[in-house]
Amino acid sequence: MRKASLSRKTNETSVHLTLELDGEGTSTIETGIGFFDHMLTLLAKHGGINLDLSCDGDLEVDQHHTVEDIGIVLGQTLREALGNKEGITRYANVMSPMDEALSSIAFDISGRSYLVYNVEGLKEKVGTFDTELVQEFFQAFASNAQVTLHINLLYGVNSHHIIESIFKGFGRVIRQGCSIDLNQKGIPSTKGSL
């Protein structure tokens, strides 16, 4: 079973997260940020991962610490759940539509942290959610999961739809990249490690 649990406590947040890679897409998510809970629920569902997440953050300041710290812990938990990465597919890419919005998401479980984020034109907020935090979340995730992640918005108008297309696509690349390739023997790298 590819599963991991981690907790992280700072003066700003207290995050507890359990991730099961080979799940059914079930989730229990409590971040205190309704829109972010919705996006993480979509991530779990479309990623086919079971995600149990709670965060008590300093939302009286703003949402930044909560969103970033969840990205940190999710990245660390994914890295731990993957173990030595033997037999994984490693690479994944999807085109993710949501009504008028279309995003391209590419993923490499490379052992190298890198984010390319080309998303322009988001409104400042969706509800009470600060949309600039989407990039902060993915930067924290990529850095701590040690993956390469490319997120490109091809087009879109509605900020909710754009962000939703990104999170659904992100779930799908996690599912594909972390899946076991029965034809892959050992670590999927000529270096012998990831």
Swiss-Prot record:
Catalytic activity of the protein: D-erythro-1-(imidazol-4-yl)glycerol 3-phosphate = 3-(imidazol-4-yl)-2-oxopropyl phosphate + H2O
Pathway info: Amino-acid biosynthesis; L-histidine biosynthesis; L-histidine from 5-phospho-alpha-D-ribose 1-diphosphate: step 6/9
A single cellular component GO annotation: cytoplasm
Classification via PROSITE patterns: IGP_DEHYDRATASE_1, IGP_DEHYDRATASE_2
GO biological process, one term: L-histidine biosynthetic process
EC number: 4.2.1.19
The UniProt record lists the keyword Hydrolase: no
Keywords for the protein's UniProt record, in alphabetical order: Amino-acid biosynthesis, Cytoplasm, Histidine biosynthesis, Lyase
The organism's place on the tree of life at top rank: Bacteria
GO molecular function: imidazoleglycerol-phosphate dehydratase activity
A Pfam family that the UniProt record links to this protein: IGPD
InterPro entries in alphabetical order: IGPD_sf (IPR038494), ImidazoleglycerolP_deHydtase (IPR000807), ImidazoleglycerP_deHydtase_CS (IPR020565), Ribosomal_Su5_D2-typ_SF (IPR020568)
Family: Belongs to the imidazoleglycerol-phosphate dehydratase family.
The protein's name: Imidazoleglycerol-phosphate dehydratase
Species of the source: Oceanobacillus iheyensis (strain DSM 14371 / CIP 107618 / JCM 11309 / KCTC 3954 / HTE831)
Species lineage: Bacteria, Bacillati, Bacillota, Bacilli, Bacillales
Recorded name of the encoding gene: hisB
